[in-house]
């Protein structure tokens, strides 16, 4: 168990100064270097006279300087707001408007003209590192102070800045490094692929820094180049893979992504979107001895609140994989529409309470009041997810409440439709999307389909292909759930965080 993230990092800087903490395409940085660089930058930040505990925006990609900047800001008592350098300009501007940062540290080239906020660019940061200014940590982020602020990808209105405190982070980190479901290896060698602006990144950097391990960063330029991506992954000595299931699906396109090529890769951690039986089965075939962990939780509850190592029995018997056993320190309940707790087996909204729950959205009391509340004397959060609890304490996922529609009198979970579509022998991946009429009632259901390789060659017309898919699914899908229109695509759009962009497709359909 750790009690202070900075003290833990400092401990490893003293006891294993020459051990690698960050490796980005062979450029290696040690724990000793991380201490020297973050000390020097923390001293400089202190000299700027910023408002105490004010948030600082950090702009960039997967560079080592990003990590060193985060550590420096934590030492100097400031929360950091990670913003990915591939973000849309409108999003960056919206974050600036909401967050009102006291400083911008730009590791990537900052694309906006800013008059009233000082900017440190990467050349200045590098020069500050070279100064090697010693620093005594006296006013680091602690307790309920904000450690980081992650902005959600909200598709409507202003993005919301989720405030995560040092206590929130400790609740998550101590659970992850001690939980038998994760079974994090000693000194973990972890893949660092999800961008820092996505809280899934905390699932790789927090346990790694807490246990003195090494992060292996994958820049976006590599991720976006399939050939380079597969060649790079095959050379990485990683033990632990942390990503969305969608990114694993992309890796599985390479036949070399297997235990023979990557014998040391023994752990897969998934969060951020639903892990399907199909993806987990493929991974089990490629990595028969690997531990595949399905985790679940919203950003507002600090990364994840439940996790389970997927068993062969689950792969054989489950239509939908369980999303885990909940954290001991975080009471998690399923409630009805009146807010009453439901018995095991009954479906309702998942709520989480306890020390992992955020204090709310930055500078947004209205949205905070809508989502955060007190439950049995503890801070709590409405996840907006449907779920149920088994008698064994396993949480089962029932889909998003906002992805639940009423069609021809039937209540339909879009994710259920998508799950069933994915069971067809012809389908590689699929999602279901509703089309609404002018009264905002569901007019029909559409299916976006990516076909398995070679399937299209077997059918002269899309109509014949659609008939074949429907025939394939007639015994497992109710008629009222079957989409009336099938749209075939080469791939499905992803959000910046690597999730299938269902809301974007819904917007496209309902223009």
Curated annotation (Swiss-Prot):
Per UniProt, ATP binds at 152-153, 294-299, 385, 397-400, 499
Q: In which pathway does it act?
A: Cell wall biogenesis; lipoteichoic acid biosynthesis
- Which residues pair up as cystines? none
Which InterPro entries does this UniProt record tie to the protein? AA_adenyl_dom, AMP-bd_C, AMP-bd_C_sf, AMP-binding_CS, AMP-dep_synth/lig_dom, ANL_N_sf, DltA, DltA-like
A GO term for molecular function: ATP binding
As recorded in UniProt, its EC number(s) are 6.2.1.54
List the GO biological process terms: lipoteichoic acid biosynthetic process
Kindly list the positions annotated as binding D-alanine: 199, 303, 499
Origin: domain of life: Bacteria
Read off the HAMAP family from this record: DltA
User: What does the protein in this record do?
Assistant: Catalyzes the first step in the D-alanylation of lipoteichoic acid (LTA), the activation of D-alanine and its transfer onto the D-alanyl carrier protein (Dcp) DltC. In an ATP-dependent two-step reaction, forms a high energy D-alanyl-AMP intermediate, followed by transfer of the D-alanyl residue as a thiol ester to the phosphopantheinyl prosthetic group of the Dcp. D-alanylation of LTA plays an important role in modulating the properties of the cell wall in Gram-positive bacteria, influencing the net charge of the cell wall.
Q: Which NCBIfam families match?
A: AA-adenyl-dom (TIGR01733), D-ala-DACP-lig (TIGR01734), PRK04813.1 (NF003417)
Q: Which family does it belong to?
A: Belongs to the ATP-dependent AMP-binding enzyme family. DltA subfamily.
Q: What is this protein called?
A: D-alanine--D-alanyl carrier protein ligase
């Amino acid at each position: 168990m750790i009690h202070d993230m900075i003290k833990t990092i400092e401990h490893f800087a003293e006891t294993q100064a020459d051990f690698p903490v960050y490796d980005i395409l062979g450029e290696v940085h040690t724990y000793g270097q991380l201490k020297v660089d973050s000390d020097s930058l923390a001293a400089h930040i202190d000299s700027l006279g910023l408002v105490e505990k004010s948030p600082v925006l950090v702009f960039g990609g997967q560079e080592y300087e990003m990590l060193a900047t985060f550590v420096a800001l934590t030492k100097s008592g400031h929360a950091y707001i990670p913003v990915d350098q591939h973000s849309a300009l409108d999003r960056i501007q919206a974050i600036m408007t909401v967050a009102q940062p006291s400083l911008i540290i730009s590791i990537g080239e900052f694309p906006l003209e800013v008059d009233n906020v000082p900017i440190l660019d990467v050349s200045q940061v590098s020069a500050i590192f070279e100064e090697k200014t010693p620093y005594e940590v006296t006013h680091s982020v602690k307790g309920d102070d904000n450690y980081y602020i992650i902005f959600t990808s909200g598709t409507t209105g202003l993005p919301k800045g989720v405030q995560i405190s040092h206590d929130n982070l400790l609740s998550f980190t101590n659970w992850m490094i001690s939980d038998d479901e994760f079974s994090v290896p000693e000194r973990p060698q972890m893949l660092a692929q999800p961008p820092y602006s996505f809280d899934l990144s905390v699932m790789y950097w927090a346990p790694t820094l807490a246990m003195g391990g090494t992060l292996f960063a994958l820049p976006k330029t590599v991720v976006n180049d399939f050939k380079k991506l597969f060649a790079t992954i095959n050379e990485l000595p990683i033990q632990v893979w942390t990503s969305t299931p969608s990114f694993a699906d992309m890796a599985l396109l390479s036949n070399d992504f297997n235990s023979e090529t990557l014998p040391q890769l023994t752990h897969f951690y998934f969060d951020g979107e639903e892990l399907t039986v199909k993806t987990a089965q493929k991974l089990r075939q490629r990595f028969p001895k690997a531990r595949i962990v399905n985790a679940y939780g919203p950003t507002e509850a600090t990364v994840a609140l439940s996790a389970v190592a997927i068993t062969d029995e689950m792969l054989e018997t489950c239509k939908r994989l369980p999303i885990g056993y909940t954290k001991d320190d975080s009471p998690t309940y399923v409630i009805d529409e009146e807010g009453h707790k439901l018995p095991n087996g009954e479906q309702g909204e998942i709520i989480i309470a306890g020390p992992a729950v955020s204090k709310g959205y930055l500078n947004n009391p209205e949205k905070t009041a809508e989502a955060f509340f007190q439950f049995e004397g503890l801070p709590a959060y409405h996840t907006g997810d449907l779920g149920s609890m088994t008698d064994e304490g396993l949480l089962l996922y029932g889909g998003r409440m906002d992805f639940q529609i009423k069609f021809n009198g039937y209540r339909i979970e879009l994710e259920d439709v998508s799950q069933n579509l994915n069971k067809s022998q012809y389908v590689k991946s699929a999602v279901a999307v509703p089309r609404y009429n002018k009264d905002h009632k569901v007019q029909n259901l559409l299916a976006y389909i990516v076909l398995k390789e070679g399937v299209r060659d077997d059918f002269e017309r899309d109509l014949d292909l659609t008939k074949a898919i429907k025939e394939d699914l007639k015994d497992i899908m109710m008629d009222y759930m079957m989409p009336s229109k099938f749209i075939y695509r080469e791939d499905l759009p992803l959000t910046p965080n690597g999730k299938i962009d269902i809301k974007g497709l819904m917007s496209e359909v309902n223009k």
